[in-house]
UniProtKB/Swiss-Prot annotation:
Glycans are attached at N48, N68, N113, N157, N165. Transmembrane segments: none annotated. Keywords: Glycoprotein, Repeat, Signal. Residues 17-160, 162-289 form the FAS1 domain. SMART domains: FAS1. Fasciclin-like arabinogalactan protein; part of the gene cluster that mediates the biosynthesis of elsinochrome C, a perelyenequinone phytotoxin structurally similar to cercosporin. The first step of elsinochrome C biosynthesis is performed by the polyketide synthase elcA which catalyzes the formation of nor-toralactone. Belongs to the fasciclin-like AGP family. This is Fasciclin-like arabinogalactan protein elcF. Residues 1-16 form the signal peptide.
Amino acid sequence: MKLFTLLLPALTSAHSLSTLLSTHPTLSTLHSLLKQFSLLDDFNTLANITVIAPTNQAYLDLANWGFNVSQIPAPVARALFQYHVLDGEWESESIIGKGKVVHTYLKPPVLTNVTAGAAVKLSSVDGTIMTESGLGVAGGVEDVNLRFDGGVLHTLNASMVLPHNITLTAQINGLGRFLELMNRAGVVAEFEGLKDVTVFVPHDDALEKADVGKMSKEQLASLLRGHVVPNRVLYGEVFGKKGGYKSSNGWEIHVGKTADGTLTVNGIKVVKEDVILYAGVAHVIDKVLVADRVEHKGDRSYLHLDAQKPLR
């Protein structure tokens, strides 16, 4: 815990968010930016919130990378700041292990297509509270549990990044093969236009094992739609409750959790959970979800995807 937290116990009592920002030695840049973009008064009226507050150094680091927040278009800046306001009060003691996916005050139609609000992952790693935002960008909390009238604030050593579409997210996360197949099947625009979506993305090695070379464009599109659950944002915490859902092509999708905590979809292991998207969430899986067989037009032969577990 930072020395500031220990030396200023008065800041644990009730006061406005504006007062907290103006008196904290590392938050003057955020305070100025919120005033510049006419958000400070709005944020002062909110209740039951958690503010993830990038420090002065975090904004300096951004500027050194060529991203000066004070110079970006106002709608984008406001969306970015709203993304740093979480729904509910999340003190550090409530964030354990993998933690939780929490919705923010960034709501549609601006720069998110998640009805409940764009999400952030909170976790605890070796005693440090961590955030994971769009594109998998991580940040570490410095000062924790600074109270104000509307809730609690944690300072962060980085600015969070807005969730992006599945195309850029797949590129950043090394899922280029899935993106390549999306382009080949002509479903990129379709997938990017979805709202409140869950996408199960096989990693590149899994897709390399799957013999999709003989599939027509239509068959490949159907296969990829089998990895998409529309109108349901299924974060990892949902898997423990188990449940059945329908994919975009009508396949049955069953999620669950094994005794050792491993998440599964139709019995296939999830190797990376809760990749935050502009329109929902993605999970990286260890195999391709397929039907028992896929009929080819013309010769009526069948394509089998090697080493894959069939859907039931």
